[in-house]
Amino acid sequence: MTDSEPQTLNNNSEITANHNDDILEYLSVDDYDYELPDQLIARYPLAQRSASKLLYLPTNNANSQVEDKLFSELPDILNAGDLIVFNDTKVMKARLFGQKDTGGKIEVLIERLVSLSDVNSAYLDEIIANSKTIDTTIIAEKHIALCHIKASKALKLGQGLVLADGHMTGIMIGRQENLFILAFDTPILPDLEQYGELPIPPYFERHADATDNTRYQTVFHDPAKLASVAAPTASLHFDDIVLEKLAAKGIQTAFVTLHVGAGTFAPVKTDNLLNHTMHSEYAHLPQATAELINQTHANGKQVIAIGTTVTRVLETAYQQTAVDGQSLSGWSGDTDIFIYPGFKFGVVDKLLTNFHLPKSTLLMLVSAFATKKSIEQAYQHAIKSQYRFFSYGDAMLLDKQVD
């Protein structure tokens, strides 16, 4: 199998978390709540990427305790022959502002581009016949997107909108669950890069600025993979200095892709985790990366996932492709994997991640990886020690642990 012919998954409902049914603790969303002083929310990045702090949770043993370190010390913790796996996605300038054709203000967040064939043709024919906003005869591939909408009144089918001071015009041509399907009369991605705003997290409580355009992207993103609406934030700590130190020590690097959706910020709205519907995101594990992972484990070395996005890709691919629970193969498709305590990890040995929002699926994932008790203690220590939280905050390095 080659990278150009990955295994695909057309029905993401087939992806089910590999949980131990005997573990029924920590299924209430309230189990993942905590109080965070507002001043510990990092709303701006540090001057240097790798200047952040690093809280290390080593493998549990009788004397195991958290260790306070600097992120620049990461190469000293890892061993030659270990493999670091990054997410090489790039964040779109996906936020747009403008007006509906009725004059009301509107905010649009592009979630992902979709194909013309995904749109109900009956809708499209009717809208083309009645549209007064845009020339719908030139709607084509790369002109249609699933979007989140903020407006005083809901956008109606066939309603037009004018965005970015008139540089972009569009029309609502359908719905997909809680998302709106918008069609534009020009290709979307070039317009976003010129007129859009980087969709920094809502808890920053500000608009994106020029610094964010650089610092809310990883240094190794692939420009061709412009499709995320949030950064893989664990990777934001890496700069050329740290990458060079890792290479000098003989630590390998590889890449996967997961295009991060706005669902990463969505709260869990059900009291019981088992009733939560996980958002879906496109993911890709190249065959070359799968082979490196297989070889790393065969050599007795560790695979380090940089962030929850990488973890979700690798563990999804493990469920879909691993032969006898061992060898991975290349894979691509949509993943809606939901990882919470009781999950049995098949690939990841260490996880580098940031500190996550209360009651979030990301906090549930790290609790599954390092145990709920260890994460609670680590967060208490981090708050007491004035660590910086969330996307621009400090990092944690977790060893896979078991209760």
Swiss-Prot record:
The enzyme class is transferase
User: Where does it primarily localize?
Assistant: cytoplasm
Superkingdom of origin organism: Bacteria
Q: What GO biological process, any one, is recorded here?
A: tRNA wobble guanine modification
Q: Which Gene3D superfamilies match?
A: QueA-like
Tell where it localizes: Cytoplasm
According to its UniProt record, the EC number is 2.4.99.17
Q: Which GO terms describe its cellular component?
A: cytoplasm
- Binding partners and assembly: Monomer.
| Name under which the protein is recorded | S-adenosylmethionine:tRNA ribosyltransferase-isomerase
**Its encoding gene is what?**
queA
